[in-house]
Amino acid sequence: MVLEQDLDPFVGGNWMNSAYKGFTFLSATWLAPNIYLLISGCLQYFYEVRKRSHYFHFRRFWTIWLKSLVIMVLLFTHIYDCYKTNESVWNVLSIITYFLALFLHVVEQPTLRIPMASLLMFWLFKFLASALVLLLRPNYTMFPMLNVVPSITFFCSLVCLLAEIYVPPANRVWYPDDAAELEETGLRPSRFTYANIFSRISFGWLSPLMKFGYRNYLTESDAWSLPPAERSSNLTIVFEKNWISHAKKKKSSLYMWGVLFLNHWKLTVVIIVLKLVQDVVAFIQPNLIRKIVIFVSSYSSEHPQPPQVGFSLAIAMFLTNVVQTALLQQYFQLGMVLGMRWRSELITAIYRKSLRLSSAARQSRSVGDIVNYMSVDTQKVCDLTMFLFVIVSGPFQIVLALTNLYHLVGYGALSGAFVTFLLFPCNVVIASIFKRFQNRQMKNKDARSQFMTEIINNIRSIKLYAWENIFLQKLLQLRNTRELRMLKKIGIVNTIGNFTWLFAPILVSAATFGTFIVLYGKTRVLSVDIVFACLSLFNLLQFPLTMLPIVVSSVLEASVAISRIYGFLTAGELDSNAVQRYPANKEPSGVCLEIKKGTFSWSGPGQNAAEPTLRDIDFVARRGELCCIVGKVGMGKSSLLEACLGNMQKHSGSVFRCGSIAYAAQQPWILNATIQENILFGLELDPEFYEKTIRACCLLRDFEILADGDQTEVGEKGISLSGGQKARISLARAVYSRSDIYLLDDILSAVDQHVNRDLVRNLLGSKGLLRSRCVILSTNSLTVLKEASMIYMLRNGKIIESGSFTQLSSSPDSQLFQLLSEFSKKDTASSTGADTPLSRSQSVITSSTDVTSSASRSSDTVSNYPKATIKGTGRIRKRLTDEDNVKATGQAAEKMERGKVKWKVYWTYFKACSLFLIFLYFLFIIGGIGMNVGTNVWLKHWSEVNTQLGYNPKPYFYLGIYTLFGLLSCALISLSSLTITVFCAIKSCRYLHDSMVKAVLRAPMSFFETTPTGRILNRFSSDVYRVDEVISRVFMFFFRNLFQIVFVLAVICYSSPMFMILIVPLFFLYRYNQVYYTQTSRELKRLDSVTRSPLYAHFQESLGGLSTIRAYDMEDTFISENDIRVDTNHRIWFLYFSSNRWQAIRVEAIGALVVFSSAFFGVLSAVRGNPNSGLVGLSLSYAVQITQSLTFVVRQSVDVETNIVSVERMLEYIGLPSEAPSIIPDHRPPEGWPSHGAIKFDHYSVRYRENLPLVLNDISVNIKPQEKIGIVGRTGAGKSTLTLALFRLIEPTSGDIQLDDINITSIGLHDLRSRLAIIPQENQAFEGTIRENLDPNANATDEEIWHALEAASLKQFIQTLDGGLYSRVTEGGANLSSGQRQLMCLTRALLTPTRVLLLDEATAAVDVETDAIVQRTIRERFNDRTILTIAHRINTVMDSNRILVLDHGKVVEFDSTKKLLENKASLFYSLAKESGLI
């Protein structure tokens, strides 16, 4: 190829003709874009554009018309030029190229969201080529066209290039699929999907959001949708395919890594290539520094280099920085995208697995463990991708550094390499210790988190039993003696590792320089250019040496997480063939469900399990029949229903099911949604049948009471509802589903007696709504048995008898006959909580209208209504995040602070750290960085002396001082790290955590009932983690980088005083960028935290209702809901880490300007006659470090603000309103109080919360010692509120309660609650031993506990357990039946020495035989005590001394049973009549 200065191609006017003088450089430049487009354009069209659908809406794309017009101008120009010059070959090629460009533009814009890369690069190359031709080509005035063609091409290419990179406004939607998404979700498509290559490199696509966020506070709705490639539903398809075909078949978690990489191998390759190219570019800088130092040094000699060489090197430094920044930010961005994809895939896989988990696998893992897999472990794997590829890049950087060092110092580099590799074993040892400590710490955190979860879930019982201090001490022991002690060890190991990594470059440089002196000291000079080039290489070498051990440790930590996730994903699943499914049987008495010789257990095959739970079961249920299952507590009634659902391990036999199933669990599972959404459960609303359903389930009256009716937000686990309301909503959900088979687990135990009868009449009776369906009911209620077509009686997991009610009741040998004979005078309908709890929005019933539905009187059945259909959206509920507005009865939205965090929060945190320790930290960090600068200044002085003298005087003296400076610098910086990350962090986190847990335990019950459990636990997990480990580390790096920048700028200003002119404008530019970025990034970070809570809450909620979800075949709907929540969080997170890249590329551009300025002023100073190569080398070696330091300071300033929010949130809880004091020293009740048990309510009124109506209104009652009082009333009358009032879970509005003549508000809560005994509605149990559950204070002996267990009919069961009193109770008492947990509550009462006992339906969940035993025990053991019995079954209080009748929160009757029954106008008489006792 020939250059233009040697050969002129324009002779004779034919400027593109290569036939005259040969093919030239400009000819190639002119033709290259055409050839590029012909090849790449055709390939991209056939492989990308042609496969897509076309939406030809030209009128909406004005850029098409503009580009078409410009291309027409170019075509006309070239055709005319071809005609004038008679040159056809090159013009024809250009004409063909422009026709191809026109065609591609026409099909491009309505088809692709982003410009075709081939077209974009074509116009860029064409623009540069025409500019180059205009600059280098001679100006021939003889041939005007020779100027016209490149000039027109130049301007037309520029227009097309600008039109091609044009991005549509953010408020415009251009494509039909985007419009559909906008209509469905309300979210605008991500600007990323419209971004061209330049916009993606510069992250300009994010600028509209940054601008909006700078001027406004961002909300979730402002965030754009997630790009389609990042959505969990799309990612899961590929993951599950590869998981099934690879990892699932193997027996090692290593294959799971393979699946994760296999899913995104193309992206992985791109990331690695980007990082390696960036490494190569980064190592150009030391060579440029050396050349600039040599250039400056040349002006101290007789042969200075031309000035343009120096300025060119300065420009090269700037361009190298810019290119390196672009590559590095793309590497980080794609790494985060890969991590986000992994997290999405793992979360969705864990969620899907949890829906299929077998009972044995589920029992071996607590809810907290599974949630940790989803939250903690997936995040660890995700975070790994940020620096994972340093494993490849690190060795490559070390090789590059040592290779460059070899060229500079010869074999001296080998000693540096030796020291480098010598440090690896040390780092590996530190990493292994760190990993071991981290694993222990994870277990400590899990234990604390699990224990805290139990405290919050059982807080009502803890307060009622006055156990706050016991649980507090246990929690603080887990926290302070285990977790914080391990945190201190981790901090010390981390500090030792930091010192090693900081000192490594000093050791390497000392070894390198020392070897150089030994080998070449007499022949070569350790000059300035060698020293600072080496120094720059040592700085580059510090990153891989520092990061490799950290990355190895992170990989090991992530491997542990992957192993845990892999173990979960490969755990046992439900046997899909356990139940054989067939279409619905439409025959009038056709078999709907049948079990033949079935044996079932809760443990899987091959496990060391006890005897099967159910044995030799033969069971048949037919269409149109009501089948009842009866038996004592723990005999297997609920297990039989679970076996019908396929949730138990089937060992033998077969289960057949015909049609769909509806299931109502014994413990109703209620979604955190509206009542209507709970009933519809993802089905379309049928107004007529919906009204029929709520009438049949006796819910109309409840809707009248609730402020928002069926649109009431029920809160987490239905906390704003009573037990009876939960049960009827669960029942209504089953009825509304219009299924073929109904499995109802003891639903009648949760309602009042008159409601019980209505439900039987409306639903289960011969004229009930479900009479045409197959209904299977487990029950302890003998009343409903009269309606049963078939009764099965269970004992010890076997069906001991079955038959119709007539058959069994007429047989003297029948077990059922014996029960009927013994309890024929008792109504055994049971209940566990019909009264409204503390969190009701309203307790006063405004109407006593009989709600007996028309369903009970009509001929309607479920069969008369069409089958239910699932909503088109597949959504259970609308609400996703706490940002949505909630109704008056819903839970309050989580408070999200906006704007800057108040300085008071920082001050409080620093005081918690200790101001003296903070002072020491600043002393150490400033001294360390100053000493580091001194190290390099000394190196500069040493090299200058060598250069001036021409040899190496006193080399070991200079080397020793250099090493000493480096050692002191590393020691001081490490001490600063130890001070802030260990001593300050532990001191502050102990104060904040302990204060918060004390405040939460002392908070009133209203706080727990208006705050979701997940939100509280988030404070004790995520926020505590940030205070423990993140905040101190962020502060450390922030101040280290800040002082580093200050010292660097000082060095640059000292070496180049003219640089001070730029400091002010650069500072304002930097500050503006920081503020511009901080506002948006801070809000995105907060939104990220807010959108994570609903994701974890949904997961926890789903784990609590697995049986219900599977029974209704709603797995796909809940999976879809989970995917939506994952994507909701990820679209915020995607914008957050993209905003980091947006900021980094702009701040690092400022850093590149600093580097350029340092180099430029150094060159300029040399050219003007003031050369100082030592100062220039020193300033440049520091300037190249400032680029990332500037970025880190901005980033960490945001990290400081976003993480200090955790302190703010903890302080918010520390400042929670508190209950009354536990103990009032001046008002301690006397020993043995209450000694009599006299209770007096004196004009007592109370409401649950402010702005709510009174639930008890002017109650005046005098209860004598040892008197037995029955408390009755309709639903919502205020019965259970009396319990809350007596225990002061709610405080009076007016009036008071006196207990043995002491006003209970005048004494401490612990003194009051510990002197009362209660058997509450909620039969809560704690994880631990039986003994710890019964007597956590350890006040009773084993003999006393056994005696109490015997009285509570639990002794025989406990004795069958392997550990006896020390047998383990699993989380929430899951390994105990509901009745057994209720009897444990009775045992606690028996162990409490008190004169007052409150029973809130103590035997609701037990069978009638056990009920009789318990009632006898209460009469015998508590005969000398005052007993208040809140009754939902009227028969349980018929032997009371007096009956207290409540209505609308007022006392309407209070007299003996006999007198009230004699008065037929009394409310008690009507209640007794409704219950069938009269």
UniProtKB/Swiss-Prot annotation:
The entry annotates sugar attachment on: N86, N139
Q: Which residues lie on this side of the membrane: Vacuolar?
A: 1-25, 86-90, 138-154, 281-310, 409-411, 517-539, 932-968, 1055, 1169-1172
Q: Which residues carry this modification: Phosphoserine?
A: S839, S843, S863
Q: Which UniProt keywords apply?
A: ATP-binding, Detoxification, Glycoprotein, Membrane, Nucleotide-binding, Phosphoprotein, Repeat, Translocase, Transmembrane, Transmembrane helix, Transport, Vacuole
Regions of biased composition (Polar residues) lie at 829-840
Offer a single GO CC term for the protein: fungal-type vacuole membrane
GO BP term, example = phytochelatin 2 import into vacuole
Which domain of life does this protein belong to? Eukaryota
Q: Where are the transmembrane segments?
A: 26-46, 66-85, 91-104, 117-137, 155-175, 260-280, 311-331, 388-408, 412-432, 496-516, 540-560, 911-931, 969-990, 1034-1054, 1056-1076, 1148-1168, 1173-1193
User: Which enzyme class, named as a word?
Assistant: translocase
Name the EC number(s).
Answer: 7.-.-.-
Q: Where is the composition biased (Low complexity)?
A: 841-863
Where ATP 1 binds, per the record, is at G631, K632, V633, G634, M635, G636, K637, S638
Q: Which residues lie on this side of the membrane: Cytoplasmic?
A: 47-65, 105-116, 176-259, 332-387, 433-495, 561-910, 991-1033, 1077-1147, 1194-1478
Q: How does it sit in the membrane?
A: Multi-pass membrane protein
The consequence of inactivating this gene is: Cells lacking both abc2 and abc4 show sensitivity to cycloheximide (CHX) and 4-nitroquinoline oxide (4-NQO), and decreased accumulation of monochlorobimane-glutathione (MCIB-GS).
Q: Which SUPFAM superfamilies match?
A: ABC transporter transmembrane region, P-loop containing nucleoside triphosphate hydrolases
Annotated residues that bind ATP 2 are located at G1273, R1274, T1275, G1276, A1277, G1278, K1279, S1280
Q: Where is this region: Disordered?
A: 828-867
Q: Which PANTHER family match?
A: ATP-BINDING CASSETTE SUB-FAMILY C (PTHR24223), MULTIDRUG-RESISTANCE LIKE PROTEIN 1, ISOFORM I (PTHR24223:SF443)
Member of which family? Belongs to the ABC transporter superfamily. ABCC family. Conjugate transporter (TC 3.A.1.208) subfamily.
Task performed by this protein: Involved in vacuolar sequestration of glutathione S-conjugates. Together with abc4, required for accumulation of a red pigment (ade pigment) in the vacuole of a mutant affected in the adenine biosynthetic pathway.
What name does this protein carry? ATP-binding cassette transporter abc2
Q: Supply the source organism for this entry.
A: Schizosaccharomyces pombe (strain 972 / ATCC 24843)
Print the organism lineage: Eukaryota, Fungi, Dikarya, Ascomycota, Taphrinomycotina
